[in-house]
Amino acid sequence: MFELIPYTRFRDTPSVRFFDVTIADSNARDLVIHRGPAVSPPDAEESGAWQFYLHPHQDDNLLAASGGRTFYLVNLAWAQPFHIVRLESGGDILNIPRGTFHRSLSDPDGSVVLNQAMRNPNACLDREFRVYNSLKIPRLYQAT
């Protein structure tokens, strides 16, 4: 199941706050910048069907550094397979476990998200970022 992970404020100075946003066991960092109301991955060109990423060898730990994003999560092994999760700048870190279909929509002004991923040794970026068309996976399409 996905999880919202709080982080700790460890220091304040005039007009400045410091936070420890460390994710234990993270071994990869991705900075993902959306300009405007981007959808990732984009809808299928031919049909307009929703498309998703699914990482077989990676857990995502997403922190909105600027703006906000709405995540659509589907995991067919969960009792409730479909969830919509809002990620806001200054909010919790969203953990998306491996094997979860996910896509996101940024706010109108865009967003910047830091992913402190946990990749296992079998991870290959080409395979981890494969796009899945929901129309071609009946159970995924029905869940959304």
What are these regions (language model features)?
Residues M1-S89, S106-T144:
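Active-site region of the double-stranded beta-helix
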Residues G91-S104:
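Histidine-centered metal-chelating micro-motifs
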